[in-house]
Regions:
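N-terminal signal peptide c-region/cleavage motif recognized by signal peptidases
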Residues: 23-26
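Cleaved targeting-peptide boundary
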Residues: 28-36
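Acidic/histidine-rich, surface-exposed loop or edge segments in extracytoplasmic proteins
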Residues: 36-52, 119-135
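Extracytoplasmic/secreted envelope proteins and their assembly/folding machinery
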Residues: 57-61, 65-68, 144-148
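Sec-exported extracytoplasmic/periplasmic mature domains
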Residues: 65-73, 152, 156
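Short, intrinsically disordered low-complexity segments
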Residues: 76-108
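Glycine-rich, aromatic-bearing surface loops/beta-hairpins
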Residues: 137, 146-193
Length: 193
């Protein structure tokens, strides 16, 4: 059954579709744009307080290093395990890490400080608690919660997507998601020989 559509309605519908397409295009180009950013040192003091998963001090330090690098921390970061009572490789009640992490911060309206060298950066989505590894994400449920509240604020982020059905002492497969857009350096292209 064909419904009669007036020319006015047809033009209005075309205008809405065109505006939506232009809006999506403008948003995509804004997301792809480079921004000027500077490395900023931030102190890190993190203690894991979970009941379901247990970490050794070195295991937590390795896991946190991976998360910090994934979020865009400069690779020269150094973490020191703290609160270690179980010995090397043995689970500890409340393991932690401390150190200084260099993260990218967008250059403000005033510009960079005289001792800071700006570099080109862009926003990139990272997934900290992946949906593709449900058992690993279930074990890291409490860690993901603490990363969201204690680690993400150290970074320039946007579009944070977090969902958790964490229950202490239980693995909830597929119950945790943590993703965010973070600033990362634009890869440097090497000149051709």
């Amino acid at each position: 059954m064909d419904l009669p559509i007036s020319n006015r309605a047809r033009h209005a519908l075309s205008a809405v579709v065109a505006a939506a397409c232009l809006g999506v295009s403008a948003q995509a180009s804004a997301d792809d744009a480079t921004v000027q950013a500077v490395w900023t040192a931030k102190p890190l003091h993190f203690t894991f307080m979970g009941f379901t998963a247990k970490y050794s001090c070195d295991g937590l330090a390795d896991r946190m290093r991976g998360i910090l690098l994934l979020l865009g921390a400069r690779p020269d970061l150094k973490l020191t395990p703290v609160g270690c009572s179980g010995g090397f490789g043995r689970p500890t009640q409340f393991p932690g890490v401390t150190g200084t992490v260099n993260v990218l911060e967008p250059v403000g309206e005033k510009g960079p400080a005289p001792d800071q060298k700006p570099l080109a950066a862009h926003w990139q989505q990272v997934v900290v608690a992946p949906r593709g590894e449900p058992l690993k994400a279930a074990g890291d449920c409490e860690l993901s919660e603490q990363v969201k509240t204690s680690i993400l604020p150290l970074f320039a982020t946007r579009n944070i997507a977090y969902n958790s059905t964490c229950i202490p002492h239980q693995l909830t497969v597929g119950g945790t998601q943590l993703a965010a857009d973070v600033l990362v350096p634009v890869p440097q292209t090497e000149p051709a020989p």
